[in-house]
């Protein structure tokens, strides 16, 4: 049921109805726990990843006909009926890179290019300039298939692997996702292999200008004058590569493989994300490594582990999110069982015991990851996002998982909490904030090189991640950590937007950032009448929709108004309500309207519906849809409101 936005919304909340909603949501979430105690939900990205998987199968001639037809069904469904291209998030504008890759993949699967949807897609691609305006990763695909020469890709010599940490363009100054992607890609770009392409499929019809006539493939965006400088250097330096001594070239190859192979990470794959795994598959084939070699075979298994295969459709995820899903699900269930009137206390204890056991087993305690380049004496103690990614734990997952273990309040969690606390403190950047995976990963000039047209080569501190770290440290309550917390709060104050919100680097967007920071401020003792808090509260109230909910589009990463969308969404409504309650506004009509919206939009099965994307990988380029968000965040918000209403308090007692 949707409320008429032109009418005054009734904010009367029936406690009986609230009780029923919370219990139904609890059951829906509890049933999804896996046998070993963890939760895992689908993590959908845009069409580029499934399209690239089809292209990878044809690059290597490892074609699964049934699978690729299911992926083709998915690609057809995701095609826009407005602009007939493919967006990079639900309901988004035409995107040239996604559209070129999806069209190419569909043609690979045998799609008739004269079918109406293919004709319209082709017309849209041509109207936007064709593949020469696509991003770097699309142009790499084109080069592999011979649709364009390797001159269409940025110059990335494998000798980059030899650069020491103190040199700006060292891989150690890149983000983890860039570092793991670049290492195999450097070898691929050097060897310039050609896809097997057994069906001999090509896409000349997409090029308004023949590829060999294109004068420049580097179109920006140029974020500073350095972008133009690096474009010139890219062209000027290429002829000199033949003068690189062969011994140095071989040494660079060895350095690349010495980096990659210890991090192959078994069936979880290099970096536990799709791009490094896919380039590793191409790299091993180009190096002449047989497919049955354990390195190549296991890497292929890791890639297949990202597939979501259903009856009619299939798609490939960019990665999986079990640690994140488990910690967030645990928080929601514990909130529902909190207090003397909590529901299912005994059952929840058993569910959380199993989740905590699983989390403790997945804490990274013995592997010194890449993060140590900036703090070599720091002892490991974090969690990764995926099942296994020991070289790359992140502070966000670590904070949320540790807060769950702390809330459980059992002796067996003490060592895990101590290791997590010390690791997070050691990961604080010099400006007081936290990046997700690295310390001081903020050499912005790197985002000006031609390879970084996505603008996400780095992992600088962000407000949302920093807020979670502050929340954990405040919750743990060690007096000696107060200077660390204060530096973090100072960083957050500097990062506040003019309208009172905070940027959401990993969740969409300013509503997510606002919720994250308000929770951290509350946990760390920032008064509810602090000017920063009041300004953020006013922001959240100003963007509440007439139906009582909140919604925000991924367009906000591209410059549109903060906190605005065409519909209210369960996850974002929950974030806004949680943020307002953390600022002492439990009795505010805005909170009540949000709670009413969540109650009214719950489905009969205890779940909520949410199709739009709710998170981001790389702003302006790559967005995500966490299918678990629509479940655990509404339950967390409703359960918290229920407890606060029953106890008559306006103070949130927990940090998350």
UniProtKB/Swiss-Prot annotation:
Annotated site (Transition state stabilizer): 324, 506
Biotechnology: The fast anaerobic growth of Schizosaccharomyces japonicus in sterol-free media is an interesting trait for developing robust fungal cell factories for application in anaerobic industrial processes.
Superkingdom: Eukaryota
Single GO molecular function: lyase activity
Start and stop residues of the PFTB repeats: 68-110, 417-459, 485-525, 533-582, 591-634
EC number(s) from the headed UniProt entry: 4.2.1.129, 5.4.99.17
GO BP terms in the entry: triterpenoid biosynthetic process
Keywords: Isomerase, Lyase, Repeat
One Pfam family named in its UniProt record: SQHop_cyclase_N
GO cellular component entries: lipid droplet
Active site: 396
InterPro entries recorded: Hopene-cyclase (IPR006400), SQ_cyclase_C (IPR032696), SQ_cyclase_N (IPR032697), Squalene_cyclase (IPR018333), Terpenoid_cyclase/PrenylTrfase (IPR008930)
Reactions catalysed according to its record: squalene = hop-22(29)-ene; squalene + H2O = hopan-22-ol
Entries under Gene3D superfamilies matching the protein: 1.50.10.20
Protein's job: Squalene cyclase that catalyzes the oxygen-independent cyclization of squalene into hopanoids, a class of cyclic triterpenoids including hop-22(29)-ene, hop-17(21)-ene, hop-21(22)-ene, and hopan-22-ol.
Family: Belongs to the terpene cyclase/mutase family.
Name of this protein: Squalene-hopene cyclase
Organism: Schizosaccharomyces japonicus (strain yFS275 / FY16936) (Fission yeast)
Organism lineage string: Eukaryota, Fungi, Dikarya, Ascomycota, Taphrinomycotina
């Amino acid at each position: 049921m949707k409320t008429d936005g032109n009418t005054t919304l009734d904010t009367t909340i029936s406690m009986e109805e609230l009780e029923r909603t919370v219990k139904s949501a609890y059951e829906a979430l509890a049933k999804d726990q896996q046998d070993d105690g963890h939760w895992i939900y689908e993590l959908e990205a845009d069409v580029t990843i499934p399209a690239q998987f089809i292209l990878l199968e044809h690059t290597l001639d490892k074609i699964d006909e049934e699978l690729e037809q299911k992926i083709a069904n998915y690609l057809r469904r995701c095609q826009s009926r407005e602009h007939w291209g493919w967006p990079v998030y639900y309901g988004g504008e035409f995107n040239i890179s996604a559209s070129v890759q999806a069209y190419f993949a569909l043609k690979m699967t045998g799609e008739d290019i004269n079918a109406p949807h293919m004709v319209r897609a082709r017309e849209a691609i041509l109207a936007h300039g064709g593949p020469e305006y696509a991003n770097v990763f699309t142009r790499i695909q084109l080069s592999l298939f011979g649709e364009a020469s390797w001159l269409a890709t940025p110059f990335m010599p494998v000798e980059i692997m030899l650069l020491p940490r103190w040199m700006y363009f060292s891989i150690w100054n890149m983000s983890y996702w860039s570092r793991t992607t670049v290492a195999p890609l450097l070898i691929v770009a050097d060897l310039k292999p050609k896809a097997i392409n057994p069906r001999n499929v090509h896409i000349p019809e997409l090029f308004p200008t023949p590829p060999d006539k294109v004068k420049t493939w580097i179109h920006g965006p140029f974020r500073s004058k350095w972008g133009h400088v690096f474009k010139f250097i890219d062209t000027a330096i290429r002829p000199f590569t033949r003068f690189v001594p062969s011994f140095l070239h071989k040494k660079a190859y060895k350095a690349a493989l010495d980096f990659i192979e210890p991090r192959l990470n078994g069936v979880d794959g290099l970096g536990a994300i799709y791009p490094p795994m896919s380039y590793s598959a191409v790299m091993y084939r180009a190096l002449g490594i047989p497919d049955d070699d354990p390195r190549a075979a296991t890497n292929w298994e890791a890639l297949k582990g990202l597939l979501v295969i259903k009856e009619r459709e299939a798609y490939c995820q960019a990665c999986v999110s079990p640690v994140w899903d488990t910690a967030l699900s645990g928080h929601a269930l514990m909130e529902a069982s909190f207090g003397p009137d909590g529901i299912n206390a005994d059952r929840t204890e058993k569910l959380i015991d199993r989740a905590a056991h699983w989390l403790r087993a997945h804490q990274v305690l013995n592997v010194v990851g890449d993060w140590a380049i900036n703090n070599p004496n720091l002892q490991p103690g974090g969690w990764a996002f995926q099942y296994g990614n020991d070289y790359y734990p992140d502070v966000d997952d670590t904070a949320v998982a540790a807060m769950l273990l702390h809330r459980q309040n059992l002796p067996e969690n003490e060592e895990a909490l101590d290791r997590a606390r010390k690791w997070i403190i050691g990961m604080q950047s010099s400006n007081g904030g936290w990046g997700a995976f690295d310390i001081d990963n903020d050499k912005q000039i790197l985002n000006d090189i031609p390879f970084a047209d996505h603008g996400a080569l780095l992992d600088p501190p962000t407000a949302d991640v920093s807020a979670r770290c502050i929340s954990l440290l405040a919750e743990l309550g060690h007096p000696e950590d107060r200077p660390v917390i204060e530096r973090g709060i100072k960083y957050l104050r500097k990062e506040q937007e003019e309208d009172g919100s905070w940027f959401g680097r990993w969740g969409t967007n300013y509503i997510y950032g606002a919720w994250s920071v308000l929770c951290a401020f509350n946990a760390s003792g920032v008064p509810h009448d602090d000017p920063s808090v009041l300004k953020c509260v006013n922001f959240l109230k100003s963007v509440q929709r007439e139906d009582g909910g909140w919604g925000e589009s991924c367009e906000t990463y591209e410059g549109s108004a903060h906190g605005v969308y065409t519909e209210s969404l369960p996850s974002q409504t929950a974030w806004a309500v949680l943020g307002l309650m953390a600022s002492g506004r439990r009795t505010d009509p805005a909170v009540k309207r949000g709670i009413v919206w969540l109650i009214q939009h719950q489905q009969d099965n205890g779940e909520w519906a949410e199709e739009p994307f709710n998170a981001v990988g790389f702003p302006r380029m790559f967005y995500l849809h966490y299918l678990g968000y629509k479940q655990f965040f509404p339950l967390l918000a409703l359960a918290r409101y229920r407890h606060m209403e029953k106890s008559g308090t306006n103070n949130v007692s927990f940090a998350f």
